Amino acid sequence: HEMRKRVFTSKSFTNEHIIGAILFEKTMLSKVNGEFTADYLWNEKKIVSFLKVDKGLAEQNNGVKLMKPIPELETELKEAVEKHVFGTKMRSVIYEPNVEGIKAIVAQQFEFAKTICDAGLVPIIEPEVDINAPEKEKCEEILKAEIIEKLKTWNKEDKIMFKFTIPTIANHYLDLYDYECVVRIVALSGGYDIDKAVELLAKNNRMIASFSRALLQDLNANQSQEEF
C-alpha cells in the first residue's frame, strides 16, 4: 500500500495521462492522506478507481485458465459502491485456439460482468491471450467472434470495458466500439517490456495502455521523489 500511495500522491500521477487506477481490495480499504483511496483519487486527481475482483486462475483446461469462483462477489461489489469505486477488473488467460475453452472464458467473463453491471459498476473484462501462444492470432480471432456473439444481445445500458493483449493484427478489436455498451478498450503489456509494448500499442487506434508492470518496473522505494 505504501508503494501505491507513493505512486498516487506523486506530482506526475495526474489525469493528463491517467484516467483510471486498478486497486486491490486492501488498497480500496486503506486511506491516502486521510481519505479512502478511491475518494482521494477522484477528489484530488479526477482519476476513477477499479477494484480487482478475481481470486486468481483455475488450473489450465481446454487451452485456457478460467477464473476461480468469486464467492463473496456481491458483498465486495456493495463495498466497492460504498467506497465510490467506478468499476472492476477480472482476468482469465487463453493459451491455445481451443473454441470450447475460449467460449467458456467469454461466458464466465460476461456472467460476472452482468452481476457487476447490476451492482452499478463498470466491469473491465480481461481475457488475456498469452503473448507466447504459438497461434496467438487464431486465439484472437476466436475470442473476438465469441465476444461479438455476447455483445449482440447485451443491454446497451450495461456499460463495459475490455482489457486485451495487444493483438497481432493491428486494430483487430477496434470495431467492438460499434457497440454502445463498450466504453473503453485497454491493452495489457503481458510481459512485453515498456518499449515493445508502446511500439505495438501505437499501431492500435482507440486502445489505451493499462500497463502496470511495464510502467512500474523501474520504481523502487529508495529513489528520491524526483527519480521516482
Task: Give residue spans per PLM region.
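Glycine-rich, often proline-containing surface loops adjacent to acidic residues and nearby aromatics
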Residues: H84-S92, L121-E128
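Aromatic-anchored, glycine/proline-accented short structural segments
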Residues: C117-T168
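Residue-level preference for long, well-ordered alpha-helices that form the structural scaffold
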Residues: P69, N98-I105, K136-L143, F228
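Surface-exposed cleft-lining segments at the edges of enzyme active sites
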Residues: Q60-K65, T88-K103, D130-K136
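Alpha/beta catalytic barrel-like cores
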Residues: H1-F86, I94-E96, E146-E149, T153-M161, ...
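Alpha-helical scaffolding segments of alpha/beta enzyme cores, especially the outer helices
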Residues: T75, E79, A104-D118, E141-K150, ...
